[in-house]
């Protein structure tokens, strides 16, 4: 029950922080949220938890907030700005992976206590990193595209949530399916992979 309560709290806090970034910094706040959120979600996805009767990786809530941020950018500032935010999220993840991999190759000082912990978190299995990057790019571009298509049908301000939820649900399913397939198939039992999906 703890994970469920904490999961709901995490959901509320994550989306409240995204709204706060938007309120304080406008368009730039949402673009920054995409970059920050992508890095956070790619670190969170390493941890598996049991929640609501299933095994899931963390990062799903953060990724959902990223989808909403790109939907808001797409709705208010246009598809071009949303796509730039997607590429910024990809670039920030790539920079994080490269810099942290380089950091791991330094020989630690005899008094260092961080190397093993950093190695455990950032010595990403190539499949996970590749799966994450491929799923992110494809999922986000599909989200931006679907949102734009739905907006042609439901264009009023009152129908934003139809556009946002419609595009996010479809693109999240594709994103998760791609990520789980690339990162985990063949590395864990099929039932565990199915639960994560």
Language-model region placement:
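Membrane-interface interhelical connector segments
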Residues: 102-127
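Transmembrane alpha-helix/helix-exit interface in multi-pass inner-membrane proteins
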Residues: 87, 91-111, 132, 136-140
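Transmembrane helix-bundle signature of multi-pass membrane transporters/permeases
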Residues: 39, 89-90, 133, 137, ...
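Hydrophobic transmembrane alpha-helices
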Residues: 1-73, 80
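Extracellular/periplasmic helix-loop-helix junctions in multi-pass membrane proteins
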Residues: 179-197
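Hydrophobic alpha-helical transmembrane segments
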Residues: 8-9, 31-32, 61-64, 86, ...
């Amino acid at each position: 029950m703890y994970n469920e309560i904490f999961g709901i709290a995490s959901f509320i806090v994550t989306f409240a922080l995204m709204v706060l970034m938007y309120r304080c910094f406008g368009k730039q706040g949402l673009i920054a949220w995409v970059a920050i959120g992508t890095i956070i979600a790619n670190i969170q996805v390493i941890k598996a938890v049991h929640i609501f009767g299933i095994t899931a990786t963390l990062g799903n809530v953060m990724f959902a907030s990223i989808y909403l941020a790109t939907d808001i950018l797409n709705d208010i500032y246009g598809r071009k700005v949303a796509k730039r935010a997607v590429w910024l999220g990809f670039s920030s993840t790539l920079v994080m992976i490269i810099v942290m991999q380089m950091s791991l190759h330094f020989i630690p000082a005899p008094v260092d206590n961080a190397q093993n912990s950093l190695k455990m978190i950032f010595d990403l299995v190539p499949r996970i990193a590749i799966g994450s990057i491929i799923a992110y790019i494809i999922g986000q571009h599909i989200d931006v595209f679907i949102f734009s298509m739905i907006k042609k049908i439901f264009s009023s301000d009152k129908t934003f949530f139809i556009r946002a939820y419609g595009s996010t649900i479809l693109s999240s399913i594709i994103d998760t399916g791609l990520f789980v397939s690339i990162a985990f198939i063949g590395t864990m039992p099929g039932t565990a992979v199915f639960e994560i999906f």
